[in-house]
Amino acid sequence: MVSEQIIDISGPLKGEIEVPGDKSMTHRAIMLASLAEGTSNIYKPLLGEDCRRTMDIFRLLGVDIKEDEDKLVVNSPGYKAFKTPHQVLYTGNSGTTTRLLAGLLSGLGIESVLSGDVSIGKRPMDRVLRPLKLMDANIEGIEDNYTPLIIKPSVIKGINYQMEVASAQVKSAILFASLFSNDTTVIKELDVSRNHTETMFRHFNIPIEAERLSITTTPDAIQHIKPADFHVPGDISSAAFFIVAALITPESDVTIHNVGINPTRSGIIDIVEKMGGNIQLFNQTTGAEPTASIRIQYTPMLQPITIEGELVTKAIDELPVIALLCTQAVGTSTIKDAEELKVKETNRIDTTADMLNLLGFELQPTNDGLIIHPSEFKTNATVDSLTDHRIGMMLAVASLLSSEPVKIKQFDAVNVSFPGFLPKLKLLENEG
């Protein structure tokens, strides 16, 4: 039976919160801590379903990972002592786990099979398999390169690779494979994509050179890896839902503490500022992964915007809730260059338009994005996350514009990235 959640929340929203740890960084911290021989502590990790799939796989490879209050303690024998798994490595709904481990396991040369849920089975893996095969990885998918992915031992060579899409997952799969090559690998990017893999390689003592659109690895880089402690900042993709909720709900005033504001991920902040939203950053820290507290206040008369190019790449996961924000602008907004949305958990161009249109908003899907007209919540029709966590949370935020409760099917999908999302939203309602 399909689960349903009735969302009955009204504003104003007021108070101070933190959001769960960054999903992208938690995945990478688990992977790197597992490769390094010794003990690493990962503080404030995200323990949603996706990151648990990554943890489960490394446990099968022989890594001891314990949950200790607000941290993970990773005791690893090191990559040289990894076991050959005797069962399929299940990645669930996690594209990050699937694609990054395709590169890492190919580099390790461990015979293994990666497979996920029905959603992962529909997501293309050819964009990862092509560069890995150029590196001489012995990896195959089924039916035109979909999961399961079958990996066999091979000797990885370095490559000079021009990225075909602006994708941090593809880039990271290549980088993880390159750790085990005795050659240099050079990656040329089309556009800036999130750089957590590069910054976290350095944190775990792995040498890497990165300029704006060019990344160069060092031969036999894996030999330099050392265990390290890592503090995971709050996930800006999760914070985005509260940012938009506060902006569109009258009299709201919300502060979110310890949010990661990596410049390759801060598109939501740039977009809100361009639209004239009342947003302030303070308590900023610097370093490999900068953080800040973010204060957001209700802002009427938001300005329309065209979101394209690098701004899309910097806000790719936030675009569904940004589309909702754009419905509250005083003119028509446009999202372009967002073809990548088609290969997420759902085709997010279509699902964003379909679900918001059901509620009375006016969005037109295009081949590479959305045209969004100023519009209001008109009906409390039942909507569906379609098992996409970000669509589910976006619809919950949309309900703030309704005077009636909204029913969302398959809302439990939000647990992929934000267990406790709804209680946190209700907490701000109660404080308001």
UniProtKB/Swiss-Prot annotation:
Residues annotated as binding phosphoenolpyruvate: K23, G95, R123, Q169, R348, R390
Record-annotated active site: D317
Reactions catalysed: 3-phosphoshikimate + phosphoenolpyruvate = 5-O-(1-carboxyvinyl)-3-phosphoshikimate + phosphate
Binding site for 3-phosphoshikimate: K23, S24, R28, S167, Q169, D317, K344
Source organism, top-level taxon: Bacteria
EC number assigned by the record: 2.5.1.19
Enzyme class of the recorded protein, top EC level: transferase
Family: Belongs to the EPSP synthase family.
Name of the featured protein: 3-phosphoshikimate 1-carboxyvinyltransferase
The species this protein was found in: Staphylococcus aureus (strain JH9)
Phylogenetic lineage: Bacteria, Bacillati, Bacillota, Bacilli, Bacillales
